[in-house]
Structure formats: structure tokens, C-alpha cells
Amino acid sequence: MPTINQLVRRPRRPRESANKAPALQHNPQKRAVCVKVYTTTPKKPNSALRKVARVRIAGYGSEVIAYIPGEGHNLQEHSVVLIRGGRVKDLPGVRYHIVRGALDAKGVQGRKKARSKYGVKRGV
């Protein structure tokens, strides 16, 4: 434990919180290119085939795994996508989401509710 004198000379510094989405480099979103599009299984107790893509971030070169939200998608290798932060709790290592309705990722077909989250225009 430091003495009062030591604390006067060098005060305590607050601990910096860890960056949850380091590959975005403090940007809200980044453009990326799909390297591999595949499905993976969640950890216990859940069971499904979750759609994910391994993407290479443009102008940065690092590869991360991003989740493809919604039912059905049109993504394949070399698709250009927009990624945002946000992890998927039951998929270890997936810390990014692909933004639907931006760049090559089309919006979810037939979506009626929560449309803004899935890139769907207001069908009149």
C-alpha cells in the first residue's frame, strides 16, 4: 500500500476499460469483404445453425467473424459488407454484426416488424 507522500507525487490512475470491438478502430462501422460464409453451432444449452461470415476489414487487413442477422441472406465470398460492433452471446468469438440493407447485404425478405434493424423499406 502506498504512503500519502507517494500518492501526492503520483496519484492513482483509473483503470481503462477494454475495447469490446477493437477491429473497428473507434469507428461506428467499417467496410469489409467476405472471405468465407458458413454456419456454426451455438454453445450449450442452445441449438441451431447460426449464419456467420469471416470478413477482412478494408484498409486494415485484419480478419474477424461477423454474424449475419435475420432469416435468409444473399452473401457469398467477395461480398462487400458493412460491419458494426455487437457480440452474439451464444457464439464464442463473434463480436461483430453485419448491417443488413447496406452495400451487398440485402434486407430481410418479407420482414414486417423491426424493419429498421434488418434493412427493409416500408412496403406500402
From Swiss-Prot:
3-methylthioaspartic acid sites (modified residues): D90
Any one GO molecular-function label of the UniProt entry? structural constituent of ribosome
One Pfam family name is: Ribosom_S12_S23
Residues annotated as region Disordered? 1-29
> Which GO biological process entries does UniProt record here?
translation
Q: Which UniProt keywords apply?
A: Methylation, Ribonucleoprotein, Ribosomal protein, RNA-binding, rRNA-binding, tRNA-binding
GO cellular component, as recorded = small ribosomal subunit
What domain of life does the UniProt record list for this protein's source? Answer: Bacteria
The function of this protein is:
With S4 and S5 plays an important role in translational accuracy. Interacts with and stabilizes bases of the 16S rRNA that are involved in tRNA selection in the A site and with the mRNA backbone. Located at the interface of the 30S and 50S subunits, it traverses the body of the 30S subunit contacting proteins on the other side and probably holding the rRNA structure together. The combined cluster of proteins S8, S12 and S17 appears to hold together the shoulder and platform of the 30S subunit.
Q: How does it assemble?
A: Part of the 30S ribosomal subunit. Contacts proteins S8 and S17. May interact with IF1 in the 30S initiation complex.
Family assignment? Belongs to the universal ribosomal protein uS12 family.
HAMAP family in UniProt: Ribosomal_uS12_B
Record's protein name: Small ribosomal subunit protein uS12
What species was this sequence derived from? Anaplasma marginale (strain Florida)
